[in-house]
Amino acid sequence: IVKIGLIEDAGNKEIDAEGNLVTPGWVDIHTHYDGQVCWDEYLTPSCWHGVTTVVMGNCGVGFAPVKPGTEEFLVQLMEGVEDIPGVALNEGVSWDWESFPEYLDAIGKKNYAMDVGAMIGHGPIRSYVMGMDRCQGKEEASDGEIAEMAQITKEAIEAGALGFSTSRTYLHRDKFGEYVPGTEATAKEMRKIANTIADLGQGTLEIVSDWMDQD
């Protein structure tokens, strides 16, 4: 938007918009382009519908941080929660990062048709810190693991992440029907991460919840 009001100057290019709605670009705050950003700089189909900014990393799933050898675990989370075919993710995701700041650096090298923002997901954080075998289910994270998760969140937001997302709904399951990491994380774990974000004075906290008593 360059100017608001009656515009009398002629533009270099004018489009007849009679009968149409003219709006600023739409901001889609809930997308799952976390993998697609690796191979599609147009981010279709959002670019077809007036969207000029997308936010990914929702629902506690994503692809960073990731330890070498655990990539397929994150693919199975995304495939189960968002029904994005694992074969497409395995073919297209480049995996040339480990930390979330490195992930931002990797996608920052591309020239997208719209602005892209990302949140860091609880699932990747928990699997990175606790391991694939322990991050799902009812096992509680230790104080040291909780501190490490909070530090990873802090470093991600300082590097440019828009915030942190987690899923606490039983509707979200991985490819094999298991609850995603963080579904039953303790209040202590959630408070530590939330307080870390609050201390930063920036960043959002997104929780997809079934509104159980603990929440």
Briefly describe each language-model feature range.
Residues 34, 61-65, 124-127, 171-176, ...:
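Flexible loop/turn segments at secondary-structure boundaries
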